[in-house]
């Protein structure tokens, strides 16, 4: 099986397991990242709530998630669990999240090249069906959501 497919299905499994726990605690599960890199694997869970997330919020969610992970044991390698807010360089995971930030500057990295490139930085113009529309200089790109490896808002300090 292709490694990207394994990571993708692992993310789906973790999302299904952990999102209900986060929601039950009164937070939004903004997204989950899992990078399997041998002994330095990382499970990062982003939480959000109206008014912002405090360190205490992260600690509460981390304790609950740790308990679930200990019982369910979905990850076979050693890993570090990190619970955090999305922050200023907010990662984007879903089409709904992209739609919410239309008009913002974004940085997107694809899993594989699209039109000869993997990295795009520009204006988020919209969402069309399963594509994210990004304007880079004078060219619009329709990037399929399933090709996006990582996407972040670029904060503006105007």
From Swiss-Prot:
Determine if Cytoplasm is one of this entry's keywords: yes
Briefly state the protein's biological role. Required for maturation of 30S ribosomal subunits.
Q: Which family does it belong to?
A: Belongs to the RimP family.
Source organism superkingdom: Bacteria
Query: What's the source species' lineage?
Result: Bacteria, Pseudomonadati, Pseudomonadota, Gammaproteobacteria, Pseudomonadales
Q: State whether keyword Cytoplasm applies.
A: yes
Extract the Gene3D superfamilies matched here.
Ribosome maturation factor RimP, C-terminal domain, RimP-like superfamily, N-terminal
Q: Provide GO CC annotations from the record.
A: cytosol
Protein name (record): Ribosome maturation factor RimP
């Amino acid at each position: 099986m292709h490694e990207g497919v394994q990571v993708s299905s692992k993310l789906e499994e973790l999302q299904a397991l952990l999102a209900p726990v986060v929601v039950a605690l009164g937070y939004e599960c903004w997204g989950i990242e899992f990078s399997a890199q041998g002994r330095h694997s990382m499970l990062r869970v982003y939480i959000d709530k109206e008014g912002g997330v405090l360190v205490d919020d992260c600690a509460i969610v981390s304790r609950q998630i740790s308990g679930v992970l200990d019982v369910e044991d979905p990850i076979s390698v050693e890993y570090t669990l990190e619970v955090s807010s999305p922050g200023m360089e907010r990662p984007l995971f879903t089409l709904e999240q992209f739609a919410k930030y239309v008009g913002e500057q974004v940085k997107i990295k694809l899993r594989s090249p699209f039109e000869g490139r993997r990295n795009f930085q520009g204006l988020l113009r919209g969402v069309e069906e399963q594509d994210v529309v990004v304007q880079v200089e004078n060219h619009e790109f329709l990037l399929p959501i399933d090709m996006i490896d990582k996407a972040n808002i670029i904060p503006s300090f105007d």
